[in-house]
């Protein structure tokens, strides 16, 4: 396969994109976290390669300078993820922590948008027992029956969050568990050098990538500053959110004992399990690549599917109705977090590619 043919550019953006999702009828949605005040649109639909504020301009009108004027509970504050649920609606995860800093009171939420009307259907607000200061709710997956949502928190103290969608009740679990924390023994690098902020801190993101098996029985997650992929039966998590008979510390200890180590991915951001072939796809920011894992081979190694210099910090995956996979590039290593002179508006892209063949070893595009 000629270099570069594996990727197709879907859209280009003026700002840093993270999340992407594709609805059952093929509509593409993306989000732009408020990592700089220059972010004008938080959630958008991509139409003919152009960004259209979603559900409307009003929901996208929150600004740091307007905290006292615009309510954080019914406007996008700092959206990190958009995901289409099995029933066809769009869910938007807003950690409400601009620049990954202080959480805006009343802003942390999970919002469902009815794609038949393009109007918000309900909002599940998270209080500080679920999203405390220092948290950064990162990504979300939904059970096939539409009853449960599973979230990662990549903030100062990693955790998972389980939401009962019928009641709106949420519970923070595995808070501080080694599986959800940044791995102190791992240093995230780029171009062969440790990626560090001006104050010397490295990449410290905790539980970030999350994936759910097609049958909904197994949840997978991993920290970016980590190398290990973990899993847990969702049955155990469901017990934790529907009952409050056990103190949190004891419940987490019980859950921790059920966690399995799947294998090592190296530092990774986005995870997805394809409906087409059941394989897990992994974004690898350190080397501009997408990797693939056969989950039936427990403990097996990953294979590099695509290595391409244009995948500058491959971030989040989505799968279209026809099985096409999509991935965003967020260029985190080029952002003001690590380069103080970085422009406020950092161009990024959305790409698509085909699922891996069973024996695929990938294609490469030389660095440039």
Locate the predicted segments by residue:
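Beta-propeller blade signature
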Residues: 43-49, 106-118, 163-164, 168, ...
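Beta-rich, blade/repeat-based domains predominating
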Residues: 13-25, 68-89, 93, 130-149, ...
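Beta-propeller domains
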Residues: 29-64, 100-105, 109, 113-116
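Surface-exposed loop and turn segments in beta-propeller and other repeat-based domains
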Residues: 6-8, 51-74, 118-132, 170-200, ...
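Conserved beta-strand positions in repeat-built beta-propeller and related beta-rich domains
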Residues: 30-36, 75, 92-95, 151-155, ...
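Short loop/turn segments immediately following beta-strands, especially the blade-tip
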Residues: 116, 165-170, 178, 232-247, ...
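Beta-strand-rich domains and repeat architectures in extracellular enzymes and scaffolds
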Residues: 7-41
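Blade-level signature of beta-propeller repeat domains, shared across WD40, Kelch, NHL, RCC1
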Residues: 318-368
């Amino acid at each position: 396969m000629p270099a570069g043919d594996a990727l197709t550019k879907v859209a280009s953006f003026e700002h840093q994109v993270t999340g992407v999702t594709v609805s059952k009828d093929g509509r593409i949605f993306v989000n732009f976290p408020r990592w700089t005040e220059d972010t004008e649109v938080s959630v958008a639909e991509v139409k003919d390669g152009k960004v259209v504020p979603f559900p409307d301009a009003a929901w996208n009108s929150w600004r740091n300078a307007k905290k006292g004027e615009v309510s954080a509970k019914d406007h996008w504050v700092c959206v990190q993820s958009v995901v289409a649920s099995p029933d066809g609606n769009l869910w938007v995860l807003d950690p409400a922590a601009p620049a990954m800093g202080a959480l805006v009171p009343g802003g942390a939420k999970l919002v469902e948008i009815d794609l038949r009307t393009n109007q918000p259907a309900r909002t599940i607000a998270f209080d500080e027992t679920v999203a405390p200061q220092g948290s950064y709710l990162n990504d979300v997956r939904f059970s096939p029956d539409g009853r449960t949502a599973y979230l990662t928190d990549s903030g100062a103290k990693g955790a998972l969050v389980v939401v009962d969608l019928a009641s709106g009740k949420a519970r923070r679990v595995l808070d501080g568990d080694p599986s959800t924390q940044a791995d102190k023994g791992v240093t995230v690098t780029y171009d062969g050098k440790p990626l560090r902020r001006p104050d010397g801190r490295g990449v410290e993101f905790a539980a970030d990538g999350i994936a759910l098996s097609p049958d909904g029985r197994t949840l997978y997650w991993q920290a970016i500053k980590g190398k290990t992929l973990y899993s847990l039966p969702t049955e155990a998590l469901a017990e934790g959110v529907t009952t409050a008979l056990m103190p949190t510390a004891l419940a987490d200890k019980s859950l921790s004992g059920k966690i399995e180590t799947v294998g090592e991915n190296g530092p990774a951001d986005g995870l997805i399990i394809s409906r087409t072939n059941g394989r897990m796809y992994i974004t690898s920011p350190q080397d501009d690549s997408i990797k693939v894992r056969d989950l039936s081979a427990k403990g097996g190694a990953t294979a590099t599917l695509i290595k391409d210099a244009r995948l500058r910090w491959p971030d989040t995956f989505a799968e279209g109705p026809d099985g096409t996979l999509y991935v965003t590039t967020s260029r985190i290593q080029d952002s003001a977090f690590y380069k103080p002179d970085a422009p406020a508006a950092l161009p990024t892209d959305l790409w698509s590619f085909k699922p891996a063949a069973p024996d695929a070893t990938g294609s490469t595009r030389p660095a440039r």
